[in-house]
């Protein structure tokens, strides 16, 4: 049932973005980055593009139990039209796969695109890690892993790139700390049970490592962060921003006054028929241009 909800939401996003999609974009579909059935990625770039380009690895959302890279194809086309190579991985979903499998997969994606940079038109020295919703959590966690050897050792996953290769991070409407809300909704609780594979989340030390604000360091890359004023996950974003600001991390934040109307909900950035959605895309592109 939960996946059906995400399929409907994803289809609506796909339809909404279709009218904004540019022409002249090529897609390499389902490039294997590992041995598993979910270990595939898509690569987008301008038709006829030659040589390497700054590369965005964008991890899709879906509460770890749904969503797909295909639902955001027109978003990736928009980014590729700006001259970027865009990499969109599939990752394994809960409850069939549990944490930290998707973290390992995103790390493997970074290693794969660097190992095959020439063929995929990737510039391995100019990488940006990005994501929305659950994908934003994965992007933030992997960026922490890349830039903190202590955290990488604790989580037991070896980075596949150097910290200086990761030029920036883009985070949209993410859930960064499962311990932030002491009384999560039944929906959130069910999602976290599925993703962790454990009912006692408070007692699961490994799952506690998912809490990004507790583990980021001053070496975290420059980051763009946004969420809507009516997003239920907004407190997750404000807590992360407060932590990053306290560490002195260069943070470009797009948040909105509480009385913004119409209210901006979860994943508002994909609604390009709205002024707020267009502002988010413009700010993301400006951040990318500065960083790579």
Residue ranges and their predicted role:
Residues 1-292:
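Alpha/beta-hydrolase superfamily serine-hydrolase fold, recognizing
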